Design a protein with these regions (language model features):
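Hydrophobic/aromatic side-chain positions at a characteristic register within alpha-helices
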Residues: 321-322, 326
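Extended, hydrophobic/aromatic-rich amphipathic alpha-helical segments that build helical scaffolds
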Residues: 329-332
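Peripheral terminal and linker regions in Fe-S/redox and tRNA-modifying enzymes
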Residues: 1-320
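Long, charged low-complexity segments
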Residues: 308-319, 334-414
């Protein structure tokens, strides 16, 4: 790393290649009066004056950046006529058209309205940003877009004045990787997986206070987990408390005075996951039709969320050895690295079978541990109270698995 850095420092920085944009001349149409009250609402929320007198930037808000191909093609025809002849995508997953003359605003509004693109969305709705998540990204842990839609539905149905949240943004990533830029979100979330019993449950880490503002830029802080199913309710309670606080509309003051402490209290309120038999919904991700799972993830694909899940199992295995809980330590060790082979066990018995198949049979773990695994299988299927094992052997298994993990590369290869 140091050698490569020194080499880069010795080289001349590359010349920035800027694309030359054509200068466009077009006739400004005469302004047509409008009696549509919606125009004034649209103007207030979606139109922003430029520094150049008489010209405006027009926002075209999209929910999570979604727009159909047919509608986009029709919008392209509109863009050819007005402003600079092009539209631009924003980091907030919306579109903007620049250089709209004040005389063009009314006719542009009517044209966008006909395309259902003049919606005066509250800024907190259009400022929700989500990465693609596990729906198409193999690095993703959770379905971040599904959660975003659930949050939009929840806060829209709640008794909140969404127009009074100013420019608060919510950034949601499907895993700890920052594709949605959750570290700079006023409210940031990233997906994770947690074992509840023998089942995986989608969770999110809540982070607060991110800010992108030149020298005042700072990263959001927070490490508390709550199940994905409870995030919309958490969000509604948190935003309601902010709206009713003496600090409103100053979000930073709210966080400093009471917001962070309140968030911790809400996490405690919403972190509980009921048993599968009582409420299966917690074991499904938002917009998912099948139980939450990391099965299918294999070598060459990984994210920080997978390492986090492995770390928890291994830490628990070490702790179980110290506490003399040898059965638990053996099962946790066997389960911890199954995700590296694209496997997920439905219960402890299956975890032990898969461990034998993918680790002992392949030579990754020494054959001498097979008897311990078979003994554990017998106890799990018959009577856990009868489990007898040598603490030294169980401790050795934990260390072998830990060593495998420590020497694993970023692509889950040993």
């Amino acid at each position: 790393y140091e050698d490569e850095l020194s080499k880069l420092n010795r080289e001349e920085p590359p010349t920035v290649q800027l694309r030359t944009l054509p200068q466009r001349e077009h006739t400004i149409t005469e302004s047509k009066p409008t009696l549509d009250e919606g125009f004034f609402i649209w103007h207030e929320k979606n139109v922003e004056p430029q520094k150049q007198e008489g010209y405006y930037l027009v926002h075209i808000p999209l929910i999570l950046g979604d727009i159909t191909a047919d509608k986009l093609e029709k919008l392209a025809d509109v863009v050819e006529i007005y402003g600079e002849g092009m539209m631009r995508a924003t980091q907030g997953q919306n579109l903007v058209i620049r250089w709209i003359h004040e005389n063009e605003l009314t006719i542009l509004y009517q044209t966008l309205k006909n395309l259902d693109l003049a919606n005066p969305l509250a800024s907190i709705i259009r400022n929700i940003v989500a990465c693609t998540g596990a729906s198409t990204c193999r690095l993703g842990i959770c379905l971040s877009r599904g959660l975003a839609r659930a949050i939009i539905n929840e806060i829209s149905d709640a008794e909140l004045d969404l127009d009074k949240f100013n420019d608060i943004n919510i950034h949601i990533s499907g895993c700890p990787n920052s594709c949605s830029r959750h570290p700079i979100g006023h409210i940031g979330l990233f997906g994770a997986a947690r074992h509840i019993g023998n089942r995986l449950v989608p969770h999110y880490v809540i982070q607060l206070g991110g800010k992108l503002a030149g020298s005042e830029t700072r990263l959001a802080q927070g490490k508390e987990f709550i199940p994905a199913r409870n995030v919309p309710a958490f969000m509604t309670d948190f935003l309601r408390a902010f709206q009713e606080s003496p600090q409103h509309p100053d979000y930073e003051a709210f966080l400093e005075m009471q917001g962070r402490k309140l968030a911790e209290q809400l996490v405690t309120k919403y972190k509980h996951v009921p048993p599968f038999e009582k409420d299966k919904n917690y074991y499904f991700d938002w917009d998912a039709e099948s139980l939450f799972s990391l099965a299918g993830r294999g070598t060459g694909e990984c994210s920080a969320g997978v390492f986090d899940l492995i770390n928890i199992d291994l830490a628990s295995a070490h702790e179980s050895v110290k506490e003399g809980k040898l059965l638990s330590a053996t099962i946790l060790s066997a389960r911890s690295l199954l995700v590296t082979q694209g496997q997920e066990a439905r219960d402890s018995a299956e975890a032990l079978i898969l461990f034998s198949r993918y680790f002992i049979d392949t030579g990754l773990v020494d054959e001498s541990f097979r008897a311990l695994i078979e003994n554990t299988q017998h106890s799990v299927s018959k009577s856990e109270e009868d489990f007898i094992a040598d603490i030294g052997e169980v401790s050795a298994l934990v260390e072998v698995v830990q060593n495998l993990y420590d020497n694993m590369d970023q692509s889950l290869r040993f």
